[in-house]
Amino acid sequence: SLLVDGRSLGDIRQGVTLEVFGEGWSMGPLTDSMRAQLISMQGDLTFDVPWTSLGEYLDHVVSRGVATNVASFVGATTVRIHEVGFVNRPATPEELARMQDLVRQAMAEGALGVGSSLIYAPANYASTEELVALARAAGESGGMYISHMRDEGRGLLTATRELITIASQAGVPAEIYHLKAS
């Protein structure tokens, strides 16, 4: 973890100069309970969590010293947990509006866009419409949408169409990461 050892020697020795985070989950924005959970989940490597926003996290990493360049997407899962929690239900219009505001804040703090990891719960509880709304909020500041899609097997084409729908309806570029098609 860069929070424990910012030298990132394993990456630097392999020529990695940029580390990008936020593929579905990001280190902000955090509620108090999300922050407490992040602290309680630490294993042998422990670190302080003095931040609540994505921008504060990035500032914290840089202030501690880091060898690589760092950047982050804001996690669609993170903003969903922030407002909806871990329950399997659609976001209410009010929750969705707050989620969009969290994306806008993260974009103002330097996020590259929105990242989703739809193969895992609670990310897979998000509807296509929810993801369009979040991607659209990121697009207001030039952000993009990246996704580990809902399905990599028999539903691959449907999942790919969903990503294309999200990007086209939001008016943003998109990227599939962890594409595993055979």
PLM segments and residue spans:
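Histidine/acidic residue-rich metal-binding segments in metalloenzymes
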Residues: 56-57, 90-116, 122-182
